[in-house]
Every structure is written in structure tokens, then in C-alpha cells.
Amino acid sequence: MHISQEGLSLIKKYEGCELEAYLCPAGVLTIGYGHIKNVKEGDTITQQEANDMLLHEMVEYEDYINELVKVDLEQYQFDALCSWVFNLGPTNLISSTLLKVLNNEDYKGVPTQIKRWNKSNGEVLEGLVKRREAEALLFENKPWENV
């Protein structure tokens, strides 16, 4: 499966787009839509480069999800997982209760597991609370845009 435009919209909303390198709330040098690889202080990019970087990175995350998830997914469920993995990384998915719950076909238990991941450095962040709520709603095919 591949992420849809709706999944990309969720990521873009919660990542925001910065065309100049900055320190994110977790203290990591970031640019574009949450891009953290090989970012140096003072780096700048164009909007098109930010969009291209996001699409390029999504291929890797899609592959991880397609490999790790052993049950059938609807597009909206896949999109929610793409946002979660994009934000948290595939390593967290591999070791998560979320993946265990999902692969046990407990689809109703997944939104609760999504929402558990709302901390950075042990501190609950309001932005992560909102993002996880939006991802949980999308996973259930409910409107998420107003979160």
C-alpha cells in the first residue's frame, strides 16, 4: 500500500513546513515536513524540495508498515499508521504494543495504542496529544481535520 493524499495532509498539518533548519520541540535539527536526516544549522530548502523530501521519505515508511503489519488494512488505517511511523520512526513500531494489537486483528484497540505515544523526553506535549488524536480518528475513518 501507499499513503494517500489524506494521509499526507495529516502529516503536513501536524509537522508544519519550515524552509529553514530549526530545533523541533524534541531538540532535533529539522527542516521541511519534519525531515531530520543530514540537516545542518543554516540549511534552507524550497517548498518543492520539502514536498519531494516528504514523498521520498514516505516510501521507506510505507515499506516498513507493509512488511510489519500482517493483517489487511483499509487505506485510512494505513494512512494513520504512516503518520504515526513518520513521526515516531519504524523502530518504535517494531517494539510497540500497537503492532501486537493490530496483528492480533484487534482493530478497535489500535486507536488507544496510537494515543499512548504523546510524550517527548518523558513529557506530554500538546501537539503530540492532538496529532495522536487525529491519527486515532483517521484510523477509525472519522473526521480528524478539526483536532
Segments the model singles out, each with a brief description of its role:
Residues 56, 83-88:
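Short, residue-level hotspots on alpha-helical faces of the histone-fold
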Residues 11, 77-85, 113-115:
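Short alpha-helical scaffolding segments that buttress acidic/His motifs in well-ordered protein cores
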Residues 1-28, 33-63, 68-72, 91-147:
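Long, amphipathic alpha-helical surface segments
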